[in-house]
Amino acid sequence: MLVRFSVENFLSFKNLTEFSMVAGKMTRHSGHIAVCNHKRLLKGAFIFGANASGKTNLIRAISFARNIVLNGIERTNCDKKFFRIDEDCKDNPGVFQFDIFSQGHFYSYGFAISYAAAVEEEWLYQIDNPNKEFCVFLRSKQENDETFTISSDIQFKDGRQEARFSVYKDDISSSKMKQTLFLRDIAMRSPEDSPEYQPFR
């Protein structure tokens, strides 16, 4: 279930723009509210606005980011998707973030990509506790390098799982994987979809 979507430097969105399904304080239409782990979320929403105000581009942004998660950057057209009114934006990454509710937990997943079709950064946090985020993984590109560093708060109890995760980390840290999202790579290797990946299907 989508809780929030954020986008920056994509088509008509230069600055960070957010679409939220978190319910406001009004309680007039309580039947339109779903309560998930004590958080009130809208069951549905409409997008209103004047012509050429960005409604279609918001849908395009969600579709573009979802396509990258499901099919990979190499199968996604990234040409001229940056905010073209400002030429400086050509060299800035496009940023996409999904906050989702899946299998009883809240997650925040996002990535930043260059429009040369390469991952700059990628992150996945479990955000059940508003005061403390749990880092499932944070993938950051090294300065002046094409390789990545991976950090995580996961404490493995099973040595086999830790070894498996270590192999994933080593593989995705390579410069050869700069067009591959870590979340997609894990999902493709796993027999079952992870709860963080399922909402994108």
Segments (PLM) and residue ranges:
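Short aromatic-acidic-glycine turn motif
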Residues: T27, G72, N131
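Conserved P-loop NTP-binding catalytic core
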Residues: A34, H38-F46, A50, I59-A117
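Electropositive, glycine-dotted interaction segments
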Residues: S108-R201
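Short acidic/polar mixed-charge low-complexity motifs
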Residues: F13-N15, Q103-Y107, N131
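Short acidic, glycine-rich loop/turn motifs
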Residues: V7, F98-G104, L124-D128
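A generic structural signal for short, non-catalytic loop/turn and secondary-structure boundary residues
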Residues: S12-K14, R40, D91, P130, ...
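Intrinsically disordered, low-complexity boundary segments flanking structured domains
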Residues: R4-E8, R84-D86, R164-D170
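Pre-Walker A-like glycine/lysine-rich segment at the N-terminus of P-loop NTPase domains
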Residues: M1-F64
